[in-house]
């Protein structure tokens, strides 16, 4: 896409939001409580702040304010307000390609923000536990939240991911013509690394004329030991392993497709 010469500030709002899910099987009530406590500590407000702060660095934003809170009995939230760093628009890469995977946070922006909320959940019957994190990165100007996509999925190891990206508003070029998007995109997947795409089955639902893009991701490989909390698969009988595998897979498909499915 040809670079635009703008009149004034770039008034486009670009919003990236996604839900990530981690699924676990905990055999007893004590194990379920243990999983919730573990995941609640793993994704506490301090760690989420670190992840979101690095996200700000990746997209090229200055942190203006950070608000964070851990909740009882569980859950956490972080909100960061950010401002765009001084940057030459000519240096902004607007092509479709994956963002970085740095080895390394949430804050307040003047016109942009990053926020995350966590939702640990379990049910006394069936032994299934889920952890959900809702994340939104919304920016104004030339910086793009898509740069942070690769990093966030990598940091928040996920079994299922649903992603939405939309562009709203318009900006004008020096001739007064309105532009409702300022970069090329035909799929969110184009901003993921090949290694990331190899791990997941993915489906797109896009409404190009409305600048709305949606991608769903489901982890391809199923290894039962990855989903067990304080229980080893080899300590279970064959029938128990089959029953737990079926329950986990059904849970994952229901979350992925967003509907309840009949028992097989």
Swiss-Prot record:
Instruction: Quickly give the catalysed reaction.
Output: S-adenosyl-L-methionine + H(+) = S-adenosyl 3-(methylsulfanyl)propylamine + CO2
**Record-level Gene Ontology MF annotations:** adenosylmethionine decarboxylase activity
Q: In which pathway does it act?
A: Amine and polyamine biosynthesis; S-adenosylmethioninamine biosynthesis; S-adenosylmethioninamine from S-adenosyl-L-methionine: step 1/1
Q: Which GO terms describe its cellular component?
A: cytosol
Q: What is its EC number?
A: 4.1.1.50
Note the Pfam families from the entry: AdoMet_dc (PF02675)
Provide the cofactor list for this protein: pyruvate
- Keyword entries, A-Z: Autocatalytic cleavage, Decarboxylase, Lyase, Polyamine biosynthesis, Pyruvate, S-adenosyl-L-methionine, Schiff base, Spermidine biosynthesis, Zymogen
GO BP field: spermidine biosynthetic process
Task: Give the positions of the site Cleavage (non-hydrolytic).
Answer: 111-112
> Which residues are annotated with the PTM Pyruvic acid (Ser)?
112
Q: Which top EC class applies here? A: lyase
What does this chain do? Catalyzes the decarboxylation of S-adenosylmethionine to S-adenosylmethioninamine (dcAdoMet), the propylamine donor required for the synthesis of the polyamines spermine and spermidine from the diamine putrescine.
Subunit info here reads: Heterooctamer of four alpha and four beta chains arranged as a tetramer of alpha/beta heterodimers.
What is this protein's record name? S-adenosylmethionine decarboxylase proenzyme
């Amino acid at each position: 896409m040809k670079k635009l010469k703008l009149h004034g500030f770039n008034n486009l709002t670009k919003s990236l939001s996604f839900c990530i899910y981690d699924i676990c099987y905990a055999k007893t009530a004590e194990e379920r409580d243990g999983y919730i406590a573990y995941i609640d500590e793993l994704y506490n407000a301090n760690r989420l702040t670190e992840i979101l702060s690095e996200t700000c660095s990746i997209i090229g934003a200055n942190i203006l304010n950070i608000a964070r809170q851990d909740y009882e009995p569980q859950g956490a939230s972080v909100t960061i307000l950010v401002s765009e760093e001084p940057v030459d628009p000519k240096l902004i890469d607007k092509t479709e390609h994956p963002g970085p995977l740095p080895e390394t946070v949430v804050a307040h922006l003047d016109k942009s923000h990053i926020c995350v909320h966590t939702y640990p959940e379990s049910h006394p019957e069936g032994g299934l536990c889920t952890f959900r994190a809702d994340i939104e990165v919304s920016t104004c100007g030339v910086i793009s939240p898509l740069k942070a996509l690769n990093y966030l999925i990598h940091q928040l190891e996920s079994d299922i991911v649903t992603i939405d990206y939309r562009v709203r508003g318009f900006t004008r070029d020096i001739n007064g013509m309105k532009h409702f998007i300022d970069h090329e995109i035909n799929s969110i997947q184009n901003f993921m690394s090949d290694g990331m795409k190899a791990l997941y089955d993915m489906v797109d639902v896009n409404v190009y004329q409305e600048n709305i893009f949606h991608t769903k991701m489901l982890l391809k490989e199923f290894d039962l030991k990855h989903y067990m909390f304080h229980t080893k698969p080899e300590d279970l009988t064959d029938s128990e392993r089959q029953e737990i595998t079926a329950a986990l897979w059904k849970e994952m498909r229901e979350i992925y497709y967003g509907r309840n499915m009949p028992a097989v």
